[in-house]
Amino acid sequence: MMGNKKIVLAYSGGLDTSVAVKWLTDKGFDVIADCMDVGEGKDLNFIHDKALQVGAVESVVLDCKEEFAKIFVGAALKGNLMYENKYPLVSALSRPLIAQKLVEVAKEKGATAIAHGCTGKGNDQVRFEVAIHSLAPELEVIAPVREWHWAREEEIEYANQNGVPIPADLDNPYSIDMNLWGRAIEAGVLENPWNTCPEDAFFMTNSVENAPNEAEFIEVEFKEGLPIALNGKSLELHEIIKKVNIIAGKHGIGRIDHIENRLVGIKSREFYECPAAITLLKAHKDLEDLTFVRELAHFKPVLENELANLIYNGLWFNPATKALIAYLDETQKVVNGIVKIKLYKGLATPVGRKSTNSLYSEKLATYTAADEFDQAAAVGFIKLWGLPTQVNAQVNLK
């Protein structure tokens, strides 16, 4: 007699994925629950045990924080990545890593399918499924929430009928997604773009009004584009991000209200809390300004925008993304140094920077007697630089 087919479920411990365990079991699958820790701050032991309680045959919990930080957040930092110049790709960065781990567990356990808890309305279904099929085209992907078409009340009724525990925070009016790089908030009163986000929606950040009245200064050291130390203390990247989240969040830094163009064709209203992301991205860009030649400083943002779009749209494993990340790695060889940042009332402001790769020459920039800039050379430069414009004027402005 053949056993049930195995399926690996991306498991969060929430209502949707807990109900999905029972629903998939009823469909004839042996469910392997797979929870990837990318810095949500959840009780992983509780999630592990709950998966078994609701019917999973096996529960896997993976610590992915440093891998998430170095590879995925690392690319975002090196590229100064902001979708639509506003959103630092909080959720979008975690999806390819989660998909990759789901595929690895599926292959290790001999599963024939993978399931996720995304709805049919958002970007994440695309990100997961494109990533999974990029890595393992042979695996079937099932989206229970997309298939069962239940209203929330029907889902709760199904859970009660099948002994699936109802989470204590189910009455939370907001949909939340959180990882090391930030926290996404949507739904509830936020669906009306005129409504101000209530203060009870925030978790990582103080309001500007409640932020300290005194500024705080931090120093972040970078090596090849990535932070390696905070205030002189060497730390793993995920630890630096965690600490900066706390420090910058206290000062009200990182709140973002975004009318976002989703991949699936609709606009959505999203709130984000990204204190570390905003702070570290500003510090990183400031160090690039110190160490990049002009041509690179002007050209790189063009590719940054393309890469942000690729990642937002679920194409992390596309060859174009791989090529652009390789370009970023090449540019970051000179991005070494320390940036001093002022944190005050919602603003993270770089106020000092130094680098062994600095292209800033005080002797060339100064207006004092120490000036080494050859001002006499400017006459010939100006004449040659403006020559095409001058010739055009002589020919056409008659």
From Swiss-Prot:
SUPFAM superfamilies: Adenine nucleotide alpha hydrolases-like (SSF52402), Argininosuccinate synthetase, C-terminal domain (SSF69864). ATP binds at A10, Y11, S12, G13, G14, L15, D16, T17, S18, G117. The keyword Hydrolase does not apply. Belongs to the argininosuccinate synthase family. Type 1 subfamily. It catalyses: L-citrulline + L-aspartate + ATP = 2-(N(omega)-L-arginino)succinate + AMP + diphosphate + H(+). It is an enzyme of class 6 (ligase). This is Argininosuccinate synthase. The gene is argG. Its EC number is 6.3.4.5. HAMAP family: Arg_succ_synth_type1 (MF_00005). One of its GO terms (molecular function) is ATP binding.
